[in-house]
Design a protein with these regions (language model features):
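Helix-loop-helix "hinge/cap" segment bordering the ligand-binding cleft or interdomain interface
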Residues: 19, 131-208, 222-260, 331-337, ...
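Immediate post-signal peptide segment of exported/extracytoplasmic ligand-binding proteins
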Residues: 20-40, 187-193, 450
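Hinge/lid segment of periplasmic solute-binding proteins
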Residues: 21-31, 94-147, 156, 177-180, ...
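Short, polar/charged alpha-helical segment
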Residues: 25-33, 45-65, 149, 153, ...
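Extracytoplasmic "Venus flytrap"/periplasmic binding protein-like
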Residues: 41, 56-125, 135-138, 156-165, ...
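Extracytoplasmic/periplasmic substrate-recognition and gating elements
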Residues: 65, 134, 298-367, 401, ...
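Extracytoplasmic ligand-binding clamshell segments of periplasmic binding protein
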Residues: 74-82, 197-198, 220-300, 310, ...
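Long, aromatic- and glycine/proline-rich binding clefts that accommodate carbohydrate-like moieties
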Residues: 308, 357-418, 422
Length: 450
């Protein structure tokens, strides 16, 4: 009750700050009132999805047909556009979670009925981490990240079983110990697949540190796991354990060149290699992203993938980063009640199933959510959505003395990729790599937290 009251007070203060009346909830219809003559727009990054949203509104509100239009706009930088363009931009906008807090002053606080939806339908870390303290302006809608994938066709043609365990991993390869053993077995006996030697078992990323993150979690480490924006946790033994994992992957020859030599760490660049894997079937295992045309690649290459949680290492399951995309309401809208009514519709089962059919996105629903969706015949999205439940939400903290700097910037701005590469190449021990990360992070945080 205290939370709902606090949200209501926040909503009233926000509406007053923007010089608006607050959205009006109608108990009898479980919907928001629509202001007379309201004209609002929604910004999404898919024309098919935008048109479907307009059609959904017209169906739900036949007396207000034509009140909603859509514009095509990328989610990246969308909240910045609200701050810059104000009421010249869309009323309801698709945004990236990590960009919400920095423009919270330009966003309309959500009505308590919508906040309840966010608290019960989406996964708690995604909802709480993306919203600024004391205000709710964003509800996650769709995953934005990568999941583990395996080439079923390749594995079967090479004589391996793809019978799965309870997280949809092949039982023969549901641990990294088993995958490293496969890499060692192939050292002197490279298999042929579609006329080529298979030189890669898993195209691990090192220099592109966003997609390199899962390797660092092999000993249970989580960046900012203690919730302190000034302590990413590089000094922990579990972080060094992640560097040990990279060293063991190198010793196993997880990835070699055509001449049989281990690939240098500087060439393990991540995203381009994921595309190569998807389009050219270069290895049995990889990561795939929500932005990739997975179904198109399978159809073109005549093969089938499986998607799952990542394998374990010494009993610890590796966890990739995952973010979310969702909607925000432009604080400068002239029709806040109509905007929040559209917002409500966007988080219904019908709207989520429409999103599945007309965009590349997967709903970011918590287990046992009151909303459940059907993926129809889209087994790819269904498997990927289940795999995302094992991912780690990328922290969205800001530095306490510099609200223009995200705490995660330390990870992206110091040369972590070089450290990982040096450990892979044997130029540094895991302990030396850890010591360098601790020193660099302390200096960066001291320089930027002011």
């Amino acid at each position: 009750m205290k939370i709902i009251l606090a949200v209501f007070v926040s909503l009233m203060l926000t509406a007053a700050a923007f010089g608006q009346s607050a959205p009006v909830w109608i108990d009898s219809t479980h919907s928001f009132a629509i202001e007379p003559g309201a004209k609002i727009s929604v910004a999404v990054d898919s024309d098919a999805w935008g048109a479907a949203i307009v059609a959904m509104w017209n169906k739900a509100h036949p007396n207000h047909q034509g009140a909603v239009t859509y514009i095509h706009a990328d989610a990246t930088g969308a909240t910045d556009k609200i701050s810059q363009l104000q009421d010249s931009f869309a009323d309801v906008v698709l945004a990236i979670d990590s960009e919400v807090s920095r423009n919270a002053q330009s966003l309309l606080a959500l009505d308590p009925h919508l906040v309840w939806l966010g608290q019960h339908v989406t996964q708690p870390p995604f909802f709480e981490n993306a919203n600024p303290a004391g205000s709710y302006v964003y509800i996650p809608l769709a995953y934005n990240g990568m999941v583990f994938a395996y080439n079923k066709t390749m594995l079967e043609k090479l004589g391996y079983s793809v019978r799965t365990d309870d997280v949809n991993l092949p039982r023969e390869f549901n641990t990294w110990e088993k995958i490293f053993a496969l890499a060692k077995k192939w050292k002197n006996d490279r298999p042929f697949y579609r006329g080529k030697h298979v030189n890669i078992v898993f195209p691990m990323s090192l220099t592109e540190v966003w997609s390199a993150y899962p390797s660092l979690t092999a000993d249970g480490w989580e960046i900012y796991g203690d919730g302190n924006p000034l302590d990413p946790g590089f000094e922990k033994a579990s972080f060094r354990g992640g560097l040990d994992f990279i060293k063991e992957a190198s010793k196993a020859d997880l990835w070699v060149l055509a001449n049989g030599r281990r690939i240098p760490g500087s060439s393990m660049t991540g995203l381009n290699n994921w595309d190569d894997w998807l389009n050219n079937q270069t290895a049995p295992f990889s990561l795939v992203g929500t932005w990739q045309d997975v179904k198109g690649a399978m159809e073109k290459g005549h093969y089938k993938l499986g998607f799952a949680a990542m394998p374990t290492w010494q009993g610890n399951r590796l966890t990739p980063f995952v973010g979310t995309k969702g909607f925000v309401v432009n604080g400068f809208t002239h029709y806040p009640s109509a905007a929040e009514e559209l917002y409500r519709l966007l988080y219904t089962r019908e709207a989520m199933e429409t999103m599945i059919k007309t965009s590349s996105y997967l709903p970011a629903l918590r287990k046992n959510s009151p909303i459940s969706v059907s993926y129809g015949n889209d087994w790819v999205k269904e498997e990927m959505a289940k795999a995302f439940q094992y991912s780690y939400p990328e922290p969205a903290y800001f530095l306490p003395n510099n609200q223009y700097r995200k705490a995660m910037d330390v990870y992206y701005n110091i040369p972590m990729g070089q450290i990982y590469s040096d450990v892979w190449d044997g130029k540094k021990t895991p302990a030396e790599g850890q010591a360098e990360a601790v020193t660099l992070a302390k200096k960066w945080l001291a320089d930027n937290n002011k």
